[in-house]
A protein has these predicted regions:
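Active-site acidic/histidine clusters and adjacent loop/turn architecture
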Residues: 2-26
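Proline-rich intrinsically disordered, low-complexity coils
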Residues: 12-15, 33, 49, 122, ...
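Soluble extramembrane domains of integral membrane proteins
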Residues: 17-110
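Charged, low-complexity intrinsically disordered regions
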Residues: 40, 80-192
Length: 192
C-alpha cells in the first residue's frame, strides 16, 4: 500500500493540457537540413553529417495558468575522468553578451582542470557567448560525460487564459551556433 502511494506521489506530473511531441515536431522543421529520428514521443535524435548524434528532449515546466515546453540538447561520451564533476556556464554582460564564465559546482580540483582546458579554446567560449541559452551543464561521472544545453528558443509557451500557444523558433543563426558548440565540445571531450 505504502509503495503504491509513494510511486504515485513520485510519478512525473505534467502540466494540464501538455501534449508530448508537439514542440519537437516544430523543432524538427527548424532543423530541416539535418536528419532527425524520433526516439519516443518526448525525445528525438539529430544526426549530423559527420556522425555526431545529439539527443533532444522536451522539458515541460508549469506556471500559473500556463506552461513552457523547452527543448534540451544533450551530447554523451566517454572520458578518462572518473571523479564526479559538474560544470555550469554563465554569460557575462547585461546589454551585450561579452564572455562566458565557467564555474565548478562539484569536483573542484578536477573540475578546475576541465575549466582550464575549456579556457584554452576561446572559440568555444565565443560561440557560447553568442548562443541564447537558459542553462548549460557539463556532467562527468565514472568515465562518462554529458553536455546539456537548454536553449531559449526551440520552446513553446502555452497559456490557458487567454487560450494561446506560441512557439519560439530556433533561427538558422542560433541553430548554427548551437550545433557548432556541441561539435566543438564533443571534439574537446574526446581529448580527455
Amino acid at each position: 500500500m505504502f509503495n503504491r502511494v509513494w510511486r504515485r506521489l513520485n510519478k512525473p506530473r505534467y502540466p494540464a493540457g501538455y501534449q508530448a511531441g508537439v514542440t519537437l515536431s516544430r523543432l524538427e522543421q527548424n532543423l530541416s537540413p539535418y536528419c532527425c529520428e524520433r526516439l519516443s514521443a518526448k525525445s528525438m535524435q539529430i544526426i549530423l553529417p559527420d556522425g555526431l548524434q545529439i539527443e533532444v528532449c522536451e522539458k515541460p515546466k508549469a506556471l500559473f495558468l500556463a506552461y513552457i515546453v523547452s527543448c534540451c540538447f544533450r551530447l554523451h561520451g566517454i572520458t578518462s575522468l572518473k571523479e564526479k564533476i559538474v560544470i555550469k556556464a554563465k554569460v557575462k554582460g547585461i546589454f551585450r553578451r561579452k564572455s562566458v564564465t565557467y564555474y565548478c559546482c562539484r569536483g573542484a580540483e578536477s573540475g578546475q582542470q576541465v575549466i582550464d582546458l575549456l579556457n584554452q579554446y576561446p572559440l568555444i567560449g565565443e560561440t557560447l557567448a553568442e548562443l541564447d541559452f537558459r542553462d548549460l551543464t557539463l556532467n562527468i561521472h565514472q568515465g562518462q560525460w554529458q553536455f546539456e544545453v537548454e536553449h531559449f528558443a526551440a520552446s513553446e509557451i502555452v497559456s490557458r487564459l487567454p487560450a494561446s500557444r506560441r512557439y519560439l523558433r530556433l533561427t538558422s543563426e542560433q541553430r548554427y551556433l548551437l550545433l557548432s558548440a556541441l561539435l566543438m565540445l564533443s571534439q574537446l571531450m574526446g581529448k580527455l
